[in-house]
Amino acid sequence: LAPSPEGFLGQSSYLFLRFAESAARHAHDAADLETESTLAIVAEECFARFSALAKTLDTMKVDRVEAMNPFIGPTREFERRTRGRNWVERVACTWVTMAFLQDFWRRLADGLPKAIRGEVMKALEGDTMIHVLRTELERRIALEPTLRPALALWARRLVGDTMLIAESALVHRDNPVA
């Protein structure tokens, strides 16, 4: 199994764009300035990853909009299915899906052509945003311990839905796994 470079970059760049938008909304809806400014770091890092991955498409002379377009519908459906009931569930959704997909994409990027592999791996390195989200969730749970069981169940559900998004990035002999 190896990813199609255009499909891999189209999906990952579009999802990082959506993660940036989600993190910005989380920051906007935060209850205090400390949380708002911390989540702004997540939005900034997601947007930087989007920019780096989209730039790789530009370098390959692939229209970034055309490369991302096939992933708009499935991504928005995924977001609809996984939208949390409240702010904490939405932050948990971003954390679980981002952590899972980023790890998955790092492993899948090993199958990309050597000419772009380094750029992609560099765009995906680092876990600051994952740690920031996790720390915020841990802080919320410490303030309100009754959140823990509900978030644990929510995260289990999210992993299943996120696996379906990950599976759609796989290509075997130019046939996408759907």
What residues fall within each predicted segment?
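Helix-loop segments that flank and shape redox-cofactor active sites
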Residues: 19-40, 82, 98-113
